[in-house]
């Protein structure tokens, strides 16, 4: 009957999508000191959790576009299109690195992607969350732009040898716990799941949801 309650059937988890980018372009990002992140078919280079370069596909093949976000990449290409790619990356990365360093003065560049900044610092210091090693992983849903606050996912091995998925977030997000569960389902349903937030955001509401 229409008024009967039935058990919900979960959908199949999303498959990981192969990211675009020729090996030499990925190597350029790495040699420029960027963290190379693969998410849902997109390959980007980040500094302290903020995208500063992206591999894009065009009529003439794959290339690296430099800049923070789509509009900045377009503007940077118009103004500095003749710069060698590595030099262009370094120019943008140096500016971003200055503003995203711990203790930096408030600036638009350190207000974007706070959750990814947190993930980047946990990856560089995994022992802070009881991990032996960590690497960035794709979220269960794709971000549509840099201003969209989507929890950042990482996976790795804990100090006691357990496969673990860690989801980082900043602020109070009532969808964080189900999001984290979906992230584990995507990467490893049998893994231990941890949620990392700043101390100020470890609210009782979040603990109750967990």
Residue ranges and their predicted role:
Residues 1-210:
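Charged, terminal alpha-helix-loop-beta segments
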């Amino acid at each position: 009957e229409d008024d009967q309650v039935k058990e919900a059937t979960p959908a199949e988890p999303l498959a990981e999508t192969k990211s675009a980018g020729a090996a030499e372009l990925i190597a350029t990002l790495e040699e420029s000191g960027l963290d190379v992140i693969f998410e849902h078919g997109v390959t980007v280079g980040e500094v302290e959790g903020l995208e500063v370069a992206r591999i894009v596909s065009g009529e003439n093949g794959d290339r690296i576009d430099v800049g923070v976000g789509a509009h900045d990449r377009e503007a940077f290409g118009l103004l500095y299109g003749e710069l060698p790619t590595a030099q262009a990356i370094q120019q943008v990365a140096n500016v971003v690195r200055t503003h995203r360093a711990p203790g930096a003065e408030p600036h638009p560049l350190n207000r974007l992607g706070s959750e990814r900044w947190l993930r980047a610092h946990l990856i560089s210091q995994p022992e802070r969350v009881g991990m032996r090693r960590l690497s960035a992983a794709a979220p269960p849903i794709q971000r549509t732009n840099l201003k969209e606050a989507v929890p950042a996912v990482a996976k790795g091995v804990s100090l006691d040898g357990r496969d673990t998925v860690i989801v980082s977030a900043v602020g109070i997000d009532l969808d964080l716990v189900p999001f984290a569960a979906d992230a584990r389902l995507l990467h490893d349903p049998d893994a231990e799941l941890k949620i990392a937030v700043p101390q100020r955001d470890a609210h009782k509401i979040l603990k109750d949801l967990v």
